[in-house]
């Protein structure tokens, strides 16, 4: 039975109403600092923890609740006579309900101007200590770390003479340990990220222990396949341009595959500064184009592979206006992503309520690491964020690319980074002409890319080709030249580079090397 509660929260949403309801149920309220003032100003009878313990807050508030009268009242087992006798001897009442959430460490370190000093001051000490004490003694103490649980606790108290069930206490305690683990992990990750800087080291040091913490956004209907269960989680610190920040304007619930493909499309389209459209199917771009506006870019992107675009994901880096919306509405599309949709575009899609419209701000989308699970382990690497500049390219053939060819090569190279390896991409005039993806041999990707262009009725004469990794033999080069390519961009680095460059000279095409590989698995 809950007779006394201690409330100390950073997130004050709903706390006044919750405390009023507790008071109406006859529960005495202890509190600290800003929370105590808020509750008192709302007309509630509140006892400051400093008055309760007889010991003042000290060290600029660093020591508030670290006192035996607080932790004894939380940790004492009510079923052990010796524990209760100890409380009586030292005049320590029980604390039956603890309502605490922690200093906003993650929000603090997410700010660009955050200093190490700011971060340190936002490491909560008393809060986690009380939470862990209450969660450990969950048989006797109800502990609430999430405002979403206020209503559940009140409903049970009202129905059971101020008592909360063991089942609920156990669930809330489990939530606490997940929360404190997440909190400590965020602190560890932040401090680890500063290690090299503080040691004046340029090494890319990875932590000895890698902590992951994500909040669940929603359960999904199923995973990659219907027999797999799934859920979507959001990083604690989400960059402004991340897919996880989407605002869904309309449409059915997103599926596992929708989310994965949407991320691929969104990250690709954001790499372009001019109006662009990216169409993705099964995590691979099947059409990418630049245009005068969203409508123009979409019309070009669709030409690459209209068959594969059916039921795909479409992303724009400009507002979708009425013209673009009317064009897209003519085909079956799963998800449409853009920084914004005009009112007229929204009206067009109002007649197609199953189409999922996602608004996401332009900006950085991923944090520092790329993660991949393997059996019993985790692969961690930095993001593939390298974009080569024209001055970094090395022309290795007798013929140099023309300015137009160089523009097409750089466009093709940017697209190839987002195509599953082995990747071959034909481009021309700011649009993809044929995409060969995910083949075990590079020459097969080249053949598929040329076939795709042929099927779409697109000419490859004078086209530019990007290969995400080097040509191990000249055969792949021979295929793209036979299809019509006049220039090629690739990393180089093969034992047979001389043979491949010689073949390029033999065909009188231009070849540039990036020195950068873009494998994507």
Curated annotation (Swiss-Prot):
InterPro entries: AICAR_Tfase_dup_dom_sf, Cytidine_deaminase-like, MGS-like_dom, MGS-like_dom_sf, PurH-like. Residues 1-145 form the MGS-like domain. Coiled coil: none annotated. Pathway: Purine metabolism; IMP biosynthesis via de novo pathway; 5-formamido-1-(5-phospho-D-ribosyl)imidazole-4-carboxamide from 5-amino-1-(5-phospho-D-ribosyl)imidazole-4-carboxamide (10-formyl THF route): step 1/1; Purine metabolism; IMP biosynthesis via de novo pathway; IMP from 5-formamido-1-(5-phospho-D-ribosyl)imidazole-4-carboxamide: step 1/1. Keywords: Hydrolase, Multifunctional enzyme, Purine biosynthesis, Transferase. It comes from the Bacteria. Pfam families: AICARFT_IMPCHas (PF01808), MGS (PF02142). GO terms for molecular function: IMP cyclohydrolase activity; phosphoribosylaminoimidazolecarboxamide formyltransferase activity. GO terms for cellular component: cytosol. Its EC number is 2.1.2.3, 3.5.4.10. It catalyses: (6R)-10-formyltetrahydrofolate + 5-amino-1-(5-phospho-beta-D-ribosyl)imidazole-4-carboxamide = 5-formamido-1-(5-phospho-D-ribosyl)imidazole-4-carboxamide + (6S)-5,6,7,8-tetrahydrofolate; IMP + H2O = 5-formamido-1-(5-phospho-D-ribosyl)imidazole-4-carboxamide. GO terms for biological process: 'de novo' IMP biosynthetic process. Belongs to the PurH family. NCBIfam families: PRK00881.1, purH. The IMP cyclohydrolase activity resides in the N-terminal region. This is Bifunctional purine biosynthesis protein PurH. The lineage of its organism: Bacteria, Pseudomonadati, Pseudomonadota, Betaproteobacteria, Burkholderiales. The gene is purH.
């Amino acid at each position: 039975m809950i007779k006394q509660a201690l409330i100390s929260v950073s997130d004050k949403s709903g706390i006044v109403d919750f405390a009023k309801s507790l008071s109406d149920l006859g529960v005495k309220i202890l509190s600290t600092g800003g929370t105590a003032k808020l509750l008192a100003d709302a007309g509630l009878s509140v006892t400051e923890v400093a008055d309760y313990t007889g010991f003042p807050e000290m060290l600029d508030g660093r020591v508030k609740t670290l006192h035996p009268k607080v932790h004894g009242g939380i940790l004492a087992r009510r079923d052990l006579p010796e524990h209760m006798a100890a409380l009586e001897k030292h005049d320590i009442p029980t604390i039956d309900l603890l309502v605490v959430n922690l200093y906003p460490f993650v929000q603090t370190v997410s700010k660009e101007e955050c200093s190490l000093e700011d971060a340190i001051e936002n490491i909560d000490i008393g809060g986690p200590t009380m939470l862990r004490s209450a969660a450990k003694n969950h048989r006797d103490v109800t502990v609430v770390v999430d405002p979403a649980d206020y209503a559940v606790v009140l409903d049970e108290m009202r129905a059971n003479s101020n008592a909360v069930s063991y089942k609920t206490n156990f669930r809330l305690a489990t939530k606490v340990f997940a929360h404190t683990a997440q909190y400590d992990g965020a602190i560890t990750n932040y401090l680890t990220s500063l290690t090299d800087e503080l040691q004046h080291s340029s090494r890319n040091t990875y932590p000895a222990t890698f902590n992951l913490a994500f909040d669940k956004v929603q359960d999904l209907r199923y995973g990659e396949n219907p027999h797999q269960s799934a859920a979507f989680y959001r990083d604690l610190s989400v960059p402004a341009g991340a897919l996880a920040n989407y605002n869904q304007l309309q449409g059915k619930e997103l599926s596992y595959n929708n989310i994965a493909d949407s991320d691929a499309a969104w990250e690709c389209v954001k790499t372009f500064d001019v109006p662009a459209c990216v169409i993705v199917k099964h995590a691979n771009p099947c059409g990418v184009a630049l245009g005068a506006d969203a409508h123009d870019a979409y019309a070009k992107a669709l030409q690459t592979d209209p068959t594969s675009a059916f039921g795909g994901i479409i992303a724009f880096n400009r507002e979708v206006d009425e013209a673009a919306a009317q064009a897209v509405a003519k085909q079956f599309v799963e998800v449409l992503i853009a920084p914004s949709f005009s009112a007229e575009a929204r009206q067009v899609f109002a007649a197609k309520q199953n189409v999922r419209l996602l608004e996401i701000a332009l900006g950085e989308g991923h944090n520092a690491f790329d993660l991949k699970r393997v059996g019993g382990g985790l692969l961690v690497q930095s993001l593939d964020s390298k974009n080569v500049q024209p001055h970094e390219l090395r022309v290795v053939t007798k013929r140099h690319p023309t300015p137009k060819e160089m523009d097409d090569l750089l466009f093709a190279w940017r697209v190839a980074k987002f195509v599953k390896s082995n990747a071959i991409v034909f481009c021309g005039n700011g649009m993809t002409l044929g995409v060969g993806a995910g083949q075990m041999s590079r020459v097969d990707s080249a053949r598929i890319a040329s076939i795709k262009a042929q099927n779409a009725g697109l000419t490859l004469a004078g086209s530019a080709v990007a290969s995400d990794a080097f040509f191990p033999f000249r055969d792949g080069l021979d295929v793209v030249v036979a299809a019509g390519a006049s220039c090629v961009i690739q990393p180089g680095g093969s034992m047979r580079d001389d043979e491949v460059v010689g073949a390029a000279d033999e065909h009188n095409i231009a070849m540039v090397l990036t020195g950068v590989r873009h494998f994507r698995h």
